[in-house]
């Protein structure tokens, strides 16, 4: 048997990994500006954490979860999304306690898992960046969450970004709309896809975001959630729209957008961008005021979003955004002869101790091959160390761009390499 990675997974090799790290650090810096702190949760959870919060009837739970029974006969699932584990942690660790500063602002990064057909930017193991804010029912929190994502996209260089906005209202408004949708869709049931016929019985709002052509036709004349909002829900949505306009964040209302998870209420949103003539969703989120209480905590409002890292990198690549990746070495030590082996190790370690990125030859190669390695590693300088240098105690340090050289004492490099660099224009 040829051993290969499982279907729907990927190996992120060093050159690509540098891009991942850049995007992750860029996101961390954005979160820091908004006073968010990182939280890390297990990659597997008890099955009920996901099934009860995401929704027993959602595609995620019924079709896509990686779940199994462990050796203790506990029903476990690999996490398919980030919000439910963070809410579970918020409740379990009593982050709602009075001594914890409110609102509680958390962000996360990590692997998620869904059993679905692999495609570009969407694998069975995928990586998500997300943010969650607990403790504020102020619509300004929703808008700040949207603004944070918008700032991230703008500053990292993603273009043609659009914001789609909708509301699901409070539970009363949602229940009224749910019934209106059932009344509208029931006479059309036979024309719906098999999945949507099931959704009509279990979660009719999910029919609205079906991708099946027959379902899209069926919902063209569906009632709008906006017509079923009570006074509170209508005022909340108006406040969100007003504040977005104050911040000059353009949006489009999409009343067919309902999101794939059951826990949302009031504001929901998606950011999309255009790639090769197609619209790709790059971020989605919304408000979930009942989820903390559902997990056994006190009534606590919450709002959050998630974005797929693979999809972000795909968009950055397709839109031609060059990420400023720093890959080069400060110094490469070319080693000539077995007698220089020990001194080369001493020298490279001294450079690293001074804070420089350094490498040396370990393969006893010809000098030309070593110089080629220095170029591949984008080394700023080359230090040549052979038996003659050992005898004299002096080494040649060359600027690998300008070819300017300087001969200095071994000890000078060991103790003040920054001073040596200054002599060759670095």
UniProtKB/Swiss-Prot annotation:
Catalytic activity as recorded in UniProt: tRNA(His) + L-histidine + ATP = L-histidyl-tRNA(His) + AMP + diphosphate + H(+)
Keywords from the named record: Aminoacyl-tRNA synthetase, ATP-binding, Cytoplasm, Ligase, Nucleotide-binding, Protein biosynthesis
CDD domains reported for this sequence: HisRS-like_core, HisRS_anticodon
Predominant location: cytoplasm
GO MF, any single term: ATP binding
A biological process from GO: histidyl-tRNA aminoacylation
Keyword Cytoplasm tagged: yes
Entry keyword Nucleotide-binding: yes
EC number(s) on file: 6.1.1.21
Cellular component GO terms, alphabetical: cytoplasm
Matching InterPro entries: aa-tRNA-synth_II, aa-tRNA-synth_II/BPL/LPL, Anticodon-bd, Anticodon-bd_dom_sf, His-tRNA-ligase, HisRS-like_core, HisRS/HisZ, HisRS_anticodon
One Pfam family named in its UniProt record: HGTP_anticodon
Cellular location(s): Cytoplasm
Similarity-based family: Belongs to the class-II aminoacyl-tRNA synthetase family.
Subunit details: Homodimer.
PANTHER family, alphabetized: HISTIDINE--TRNA LIGASE, MITOCHONDRIAL-RELATED (PTHR43707:SF1), HISTIDYL-TRNA SYNTHETASE (PTHR43707)
Protein name, per record: Histidine--tRNA ligase
Organism the protein comes from: Streptococcus gordonii (strain Challis / ATCC 35105 / BCRC 15272 / CH1 / DL1 / V288)
